[in-house]
From Swiss-Prot:
GO CC aspect terms: cytosol
GO biological process: tRNA methylation; tRNA wobble uridine modification
Top EC class of this enzyme: hydrolase
Organism: Phocaeicola vulgatus (strain ATCC 8482 / DSM 1447 / JCM 5826 / CCUG 4940 / NBRC 14291 / NCTC 11154)
Subcellular location per the Swiss-Prot or TrEMBL entry: Cytoplasm
GO molecular function: GTP binding; GTPase activity; metal ion binding
Function as written in the Swiss-Prot or TrEMBL entry: Exhibits a very high intrinsic GTPase hydrolysis rate. Involved in the addition of a carboxymethylaminomethyl (cmnm) group at the wobble position (U34) of certain tRNAs, forming tRNA-cmnm(5)s(2)U34.
Start and end residues of each TrmE-type G domain: 256-420
Obligatory cofactor(s): K(+)
Descriptive protein name: tRNA modification GTPase MnmE
Length: 500
């Protein structure tokens, strides 16, 4: 295992306001520094205790020091008072202030989360107590940890690869059963093992092809069988394409299934968003064009996270800013998984055919629900007329009143049915990380070029160059071969919380 020389760090690992607080200490002097401020209730000092043990005791501040200048001017103080103050000084200077009674867990390198000597101090959750303990640790030689520094040290010390480290952040942020399963799957290393296996096979062929270059004078020599390499490239192409394709599902699970609420101005889109979120998220007004930019928020419905997007109303306008908002509406429609088309049922103009021409090109391959809003103001015959106009569209349709929350519960059920994402278990390998997706896309381009080079019977040095590029992209995901830049690592770990 690769160990790195570092200082010793400390941080509060638990959220404020809980009954129990935990402080993590990690580094070469973690046990020594912790023992300086900790007095065990019984037995050996902390430095002599075995790993994976819990020790009960107390955290104490250093002995108090009295300013001796107070007693230098004894001639100005009556003799009896001077003696009393000196006795008080003697008592105070020998006493220790107990901060809290605590439990301390002990881990010795390399068998800890970070791969370093580590302690975890479990105390009462008072913010005062936690800050006092942190100050004592820093006074005795610790440094306050940076965001994500514990997991970064675990990565640098070989306890996990980079994709597993990123999964830690996903696990912390998981808000549903599906996001939890995906994070756990990545943390267990299934994704990393599959990539490492592909990478090693490519390395084998690359080394054989480069060996041929050393014997370029003997053109008849062929160490790397081209048919076997072509079969391998086809297999790798299929695996990478499957992983990259899974990103659309993984991203929807992780960040919420994107649902675009679209329609004309004043159709009730913002009112619907507020009804779904059960809060006044968007401004509602009778003035046309009130929403000029997209408004997004998430909500969990029956265990499924949805990301609702309230968009600018679609209409002809000369307002430059409003037109920019309408352009973004179409962009969000292209990105959405589900589209809610809001229609003002009371609109006498009824320019539905024109709207269809604008909207439908952005809806191909997407789930759509047509919502006839303000249906509480319609007669039964009017509802029949509306249904007839849209009879040619084989999509879900629902009459609602966003303002009165009529049929909102039914809409929520239809949304869950429309989402219909595949069931996820901890053995599934599904991509949720944009960085991974982009690297896989580049790797796919490289393996395409390898296939083309083999078909065109290009020289081994040209084919091996594309092989090396594919290896590089796969290595970038898990940081094998030490090729990941310091900037990439910083961008990843700075998004972690302090204490993790």
């Amino acid at each position: 295992m690769k160990m790195i020389n570092q200082d010793t760090i400390c941080a509060i690992a638990t959220a404020q306001g809980g009954a129990i607080g935990i402080i993590r200490v990690s580094g070469p002097k973690a046990i020594e520094i912790t023992s300086r401020i900790f007095t065990p209730a019984t037995g050996k000092p902390l430095t002599e205790r075995a790993p994976y043990t819990l020790t009960f005791g107390k955290i104490c501040s250093p002995k108090r020091k009295i300013n001796n200048t107070l007693f230098q001017q004894t001639s100005e103080i009556p003799q009896e008072k001077s003696e009393t103050l000196q006795k008080t000084s003697s008592i105070t200077s020998s006493a220790e202030e107990v901060i809290d009674e605590v439990l301390i867990s002990l881990f010795r390198a390399p068998h800890s989360y970070t791969g370093e000597d580590s302690t975890e101090i479990m105390c009462h959750g008072s913010s005062y107590i936690l800050q006092q303990v942190i100050q004592l640790l820093i006074y005795n030689g610790c440094r306050a940890a940076l965001p994500g520094e514990y997991t970064q040290r675990a990565f640098l010390n070989g306890k996990m690869d980079l994709s597993q480290a990123e999964a830690v952040a996903d696990l912390i942020a998981s808000s549903s059963a599906s996001t939890h399963r995906l994070a756990m799957s990545q943390m267990r290393g299934g994704f990393s093992k599959e990539l490492s296996n592909l990478r090693n096979q490519l390395l084998h062929f690359t080394s054989l092809m480069e060996l041929e270059l050393d014997f370029s004078d003997h053109e008849e020599l062929e160490f790397a069988n081209r048919d076997e390499l072509s079969s391998l490239a086809t297999h790798i192409e299929q695996v990478i394409a499957r992983l990259a394709h899974s990103f659309s599902v993984g991203n929807a699970i992780k960040n919420g299934i994107p649902v675009a609420i679209i329609g004309e101005t004043n159709a009730g889109k913002s009112t619907l968003l507020n009804a779904l979120l059960n809060e006044e998220k968007a401004i509602v007004s009778d003035i046309h064009g009130t929403t000029r930019d997209v408004i997004e928020d998430t909500i969990n419905l029956q265990g499924v996270t949805f990301r609702f997007i309230d968009t600018a109303g679609i209409r002809q306008t000369n307002d430059t800013i409003e037109n920019l908002g309408i352009e973004r509406t179409f962009q969000k429609m292209d990105q959405a998984y589900v589209i809610l088309w809001m229609i003002d049922s009371t609109d006498a103009q009824r320019r539905f055919e024109e709207l269809k021409a604008d909207i439908l090109p952005h809806c191909e391959g997407k789930k759509m629900i047509i919502l006839f809003n303000k249906s509480d103001l319609l007669l039964a015959t009017q509802k029949e007329e509306l249904s007839a106009i849209f009879a040619d569209m084989k999509v879900e349709k629902l009459f609602i009143s966003a303002k009165k929350r009529e049929n909102i519960t039914i809409l929520e059920k239809k949304l869950v049915q429309a989402a219909a994402l595949p069931e996820v278990n901890q053995n599934d390998i599904i991509i949720t990380n944009v960085r991974h997706y982009e690297a896989l896309t580049r790797a796919l381009d490289s393996i395409h070029r390898v296939q083309e080079g083999l078909q065109l019977e290009l020289s081994g040095d040209l084919v091996s160059e594309d092989l090396r590029q594919c290896i590089h992209e796969l290595s970038e995901i898990v940081a094998e071969g030490g090729i990941t830049s310091e900037e990439t690592l910083q961008n990843i770990f700075q998004n972690f919380c302090i204490g993790k």
